[in-house]
């Protein structure tokens, strides 16, 4: 038995302008090669773009987009008796939020080239808030996979 106590989970810090943890989580996922100031610049430009296009609070649009992309279930490969099954598993809200952020950023990076990342990210978030876009499609695909493999749920 381990003698160490379990480490407490660190709560995500909030960003300097919006004072929001979700924004900070998004910045940390945009981050590449340790360039955090660039990641902040990309996100803040995207938020400004959202503000101009929708004339709504960009933070509420961001929250709505992430809430729309967050999955309830996911599938996990489980090997049973020589064959691999895709087993549907319910996921916690923090893990779902992390997946939603990852999918949103992946979808915005895959948008057609020619525009900067802030532009792509803002349009992906606005699409996700309106319940369409590639990140929403990814969530629906995951839910369909989980529904199709519901018979294997007892392999958990």
UniProtKB/Swiss-Prot annotation:
Pfam family, one: Ribosomal_S7
Entry GO terms, CC: chloroplast; small ribosomal subunit
Gene3D superfamilies: Ribosomal protein S7 domain (1.10.455.10)
Main localisation: plastid
Coiled-coil regions listed in the entry: none
UniProt GO BP: translation
InterPro entries: Ribosomal_uS7, Ribosomal_uS7_bac/org-type, Ribosomal_uS7_CS, Ribosomal_uS7_dom, Ribosomal_uS7_dom_sf
CDD domains (UniProt xref): uS7_Chloroplast
Cell compartment(s), UniProt: Plastid, Chloroplast
PROSITE patterns, alphabetized: RIBOSOMAL_S7
A GO term for molecular function: structural constituent of ribosome
Oligomer status and interactors: Part of the 30S ribosomal subunit.
Family: Belongs to the universal ribosomal protein uS7 family.
Protein name stated in the entry: Small ribosomal subunit protein uS7c
Species of origin: Zamia furfuracea (Cardboard cycad)
Taxonomic lineage of the native organism: Eukaryota, Viridiplantae, Streptophyta, Embryophyta, Tracheophyta
